[in-house]
Curated annotation (Swiss-Prot):
Cofactor(s) in the UniProt record: [4Fe-4S] cluster
EC number, UniProt record: 4.1.99.17
Cofactor note: Binds 1 [4Fe-4S] cluster per subunit. The cluster is coordinated with 3 cysteines and an exchangeable S-adenosyl-L-methionine.
Organism domain of life: Bacteria
Gene this protein is translated from: thiC
Protein name: Phosphomethylpyrimidine synthase
Alphabetized UniProt keyword annotations: 4Fe-4S, Iron, Iron-sulfur, Lyase, Metal-binding, S-adenosyl-L-methionine, Thiamine biosynthesis, Zinc
Length: 628
């Protein structure tokens, strides 16, 4: 530990990132109560201005949007990262009566870290003794679902996915939604708790919800639900403090990360993870082989099953919700990568490939998979079966190594399901557009519709610095085809560690991709926000346009670069076309002209309307400001 690290006492000095706790403009946090008072599902309500009298003068109903920010954007909640978030799920877990509280940590490494006095100043001070399933019990959401039980978590996510859809319809927020094309998915008109239970029992969806992550606000991942996105954080050997990683977490969920993966490979991985989980309202995923490798000094050949098993228990007792495990990297697949342009690009995949070759033995994650399942179901940790042989360039897409591993992941999925363990499948990578659907179709076939979770895919390799765009294209496509969760890519991909701005850019890019996929699939209510923003745009309600967007700050800043005065926010034009060429203003005048002449078809006499409108502009001296 460095001299500086020794002097920092995080339990006294840690502070929340102030940018992450600011409420969004004209937004308030609301909570929708379920069948019991402690099921309180958060949503963000955006209030809108009335339509100006020029456009009919009507009130506009508030719009609800899915909210991943947890209590951080609730001004009524006092945030103290030193104490962590409030407990959400303990009462639900206690009521099921199938877990027990341990007397302390049971992993060897966890005990070592706890007994290391030098780490006291870095430690999160409010650690609870972990829970574990009672002997012979299975505490996974899949197990409950297959018993016909609707858990509080299932009810919670049904309310969250449905977003008060019936009320939105009654308020006129969904007068129009295009029919989607879902490629055989089973998307209902309304999400119910029973539908959630059925999807989890079938294996088509998962609720990542470790029994030791009780601060969690449950969410669901599956092709018949809203497309989710994941954001990555984590320190490295090159730096980053624990406080910085917690700040990355809160910043990421502010902008829409549905889950967060802690990919730390540097110092104090155990302590960093504790701070992250205790302050996270979203599921946390990890790649346990990274920490296991750190424990053997970075020498892959020295990894053992026993050490890896202890790492799984250590992380499960902290509350990690899903593990990426590269159990499909088999010895026979490694030679198939020899002629690739970019070889094996997955860190986890390369670690296991090196171990297999060094020992000339089969991957111990594969041979011990049943034992891993026993650990997973004792804590309800979900599998994210890693694609260690994913293509790292479009030249390598859809090759024998990639699809051979995918077939093995399908085999492992069925083993996990025999244990009633929740499971999703990781996917590529770098894939040109014409090969993306083949990836989705093959995954559905091999893995029997288990949720697919992809990194992009990147659709071209020629744009370093813009890979959030090259991958966002592929993400939107594969999300439409049936992918359940998209792992974000930042502009720094392949170039360096992302900063806060890069993280935000990556998340917003992927929120766009996910939402575009929801629209294309025809998810119920997906078009509500689009309709509201389009109406605000046509009525020149500038503030509502900003506030309904995914990133109000950037929208407002771009507008104000050229029209900074407050009066510009009631103007019936923007700087793109100016007052004389605003198509929407002209269209409104044409509508009025047609109405006055009692012309039924608005598109009749457009040319005459244009001439009359131009003359009116000249007479009014182009003064088009209106007070709201």
């Amino acid at each position: 530990m460095s001299k500086q690290e020794k002097t920092i006492n995080l339990s006294e000095s840690a502070q929340v990132d102030q940018q992450s706790v600011q409420p969004f403009p004209r937004s308030r946090k609301i909570y929708v109560e379920g069948s019991r008072p402690d099921i309180r599902v958060p949503m963000r309500e955006i209030s809108l201005h009335d339509t100006p009298t020029d456009f009919g003068g009507e009130a506009n109903a508030p719009v609800l949007v899915y909210d991943t920010s947890g209590p951080y954007t609730d001004p009524d909640v006092i945030i103290d990262v030193r104490k962590g978030l409030a407990d959400v799920r303990s009462a639900w877990i206690d009521a099921r009566g199938d877990t027990e509280r341990l007397g302390g940590l049971s992993s060897n490494f966890g005990q070592q870290r706890l007994n290391d006095a030098e780490l006291a100043k870095l430690r999160f001070n409010h650690v609870r003794n972990p829970r574990r399933a009672k002997a012979g019990a299975n505490v996974s959401q899949m197990h409950y679902a297959r018993q016909g039980i609707i858990t509080a978590e299932m009810e919670y996510v049904a309310i969250r996915e449905n977003m008060k859809l019936q009320e939105a319809r009654a308020a006129g927020l969904l007068k129009q939604q295009h029919a989607g094309h879902s490629f055989g998915a089973n998307i209902p008109k309304e999400i119910t708790a029973e539908f959630v239970r059925e999807e989890i029992a079938r294996g088509r969806a998962i609720i990542p919800a470790n029994i030791n992550h009780t601060e969690l606000e449950p969410m669901i991942i599956g092709r018949n639900f809203l497309v989710k996105i994941n954001g990555n954080i984590g320190n490295s050997a090159l730096g980053s403090s624990i406080e910085e990683e917690v700040a990355k977490l809160t910043w990421g969920i502010r902008w829409g990360s549905d889950t967060v993966m802690d990919l730390s490979t540097g110092k104090h991985i155990h302590e960093t993870r504790e701070w992250i989980i205790r302050n996270s309202p979203v599921p946390i995923g990890t790649v346990p082989i990274y920490q296991a490798l750190e424990k053997v000094g970075g020498v892959a050949e020295d990894l053992t099953w026993e050490l890896f098993r202890d790492t799984l228990i250590e992380q499960a007792e902290q509350g990690v919700d899903y593990f990426t495990i590269h159990a499909g990297v088999l010895l026979r697949y490694v030679p198939l990568t020899a002629k690739r342009v970019t070889g094996i690009v997955s860190r986890g995949g390369s670690i296991m490939a090196k171990w297999c070759l060094a020992h000339h033995q089969e991957n111990f994650l594969y041979t011990h998979f049943d034992e891993i399942c026993e650990i997973m179901k004792a804590y309800d940790v979900s599998f994210s079966l890693g694609d260690g042989l994913r293509p790292g360039s479009i030249a390598d897409a859809n090759d024998a190594a990639q699809f051979g591993e995918l077939e093995t992941l399908g085999e492992l999925t069925k083993i996990a399901w025999k244990h009633d363990v929740q499971c999703m499948i990781e996917g590529p990578g770098h894939v040109p557009m014409q090969l993306i659907k083949e990836n989705m179709d093959k995954q559905l076939e091999c893995c029997d519709e288990a949720p697919f979770y992809t990194l992009g895919p990147l659709t071209t390799d020629i744009a370093p610095g813009y890979d959030h765009i090259t991958s966002g294209i592929g993400a939107a496509m594969i999300g439409w085809f049936g992918c359940a969760m998209l792992c974000y890519v930042t502009p720094k991909e392949h170039l360096g560690l992302p900063n806060k701005d890069d993280v935000k850019t990556g998340i917003i890019t992927y929120k766009i991709a996910a939402h575009a996929a929801d629209l294309a699939k025809g998810h119920p209510g997906a078009q509500i926000r689009d309709n509201a923003l389009s109406k605000a745009r046509f009525e020149f309600r500038w503030e509502d346009q900003f506030n309904l967007g995914l990133d109000p700050d950037t929208a407002r800043a771009f507008h104000d670069e050229t029209l900074p005065k407050e009066s510009a926010k009631v103007a019936h034009f923007c700087s793109m076309c100016g007052p004389k060429f605003c198509s929407m203003k002209i269209t409104q005048e044409v509508r009025e002209y047609a109405a006055n002449l009692r012309i039924d078809a608005v598109d009749v006499s457009v040319e005459e309307g244009m001439r009359e409108q131009a003359e009116r502009f000249r007479q009014e001296g182009s003064q088009l400001y209106h007070k709201v």
